[in-house]
């Protein structure tokens, strides 16, 4: 079983420059509990705090890296969890292409930045995002079944998709929001850390 400190440190690693509330959501802990743990981690030199936002120190990174195998050995040995992760990686490639298609558009045979003036084009991409989400839901259910904490991503992805489908285009990929792409990226980072894999660029 993980400690509160590990869960908070893991949350800081996932939500870089996040505040206590954002970290609490990822850690699955109450905000007050996270604030208390962060104070201790700050005093121990494991995190840095700037204007209420936190990040790991080199010491904190080393401590966290050393704990992952100990706390996640069960998940790493779980064949169903690993299989679900591999299916996630297949869909991850599709999402990367979808986000490229969202952020750029073909004009005269050249890809240029999408200014989102073509509403029909945007709606087609959002429709594809909805289809991708439907394909991903059973995979995410498998992941959450093994690690219930991951349920926060199911809630956030669903909320972002709903907003995008309702016309709030920023919720597709805006890095300043818990957009679909932002939350997906954090889920990917979470899974990589759980399993001890490196991100492929």
Regions flagged by a language model, labelled:
Residues 51-64:
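Accessory beta->alpha helical hairpin/"wing" motif in late/C-terminal subdomains of nucleic-acid enzymes
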Residues 2-29:
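Short amphipathic alpha-helical interface segments
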Residues 152-201:
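C-terminal regulatory/effector modules of DNA-binding transcriptional regulators
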Residues 16-19, 83, 103-104, 171, ...:
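Intrinsically disordered, low-complexity terminal tails/loops enriched in metal-binding residues
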Residues 61-87:
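Short, amphipathic alpha-helical interaction segments positioned at domain boundaries
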Residues 79-165, 169:
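Exposed, interaction-prone assembly regions rather than primary DNA-binding/catalytic cores
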Residues 42-52:
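A short, conserved structural fragment
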Residues 27-43:
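Short amphipathic alpha-helical interaction segments
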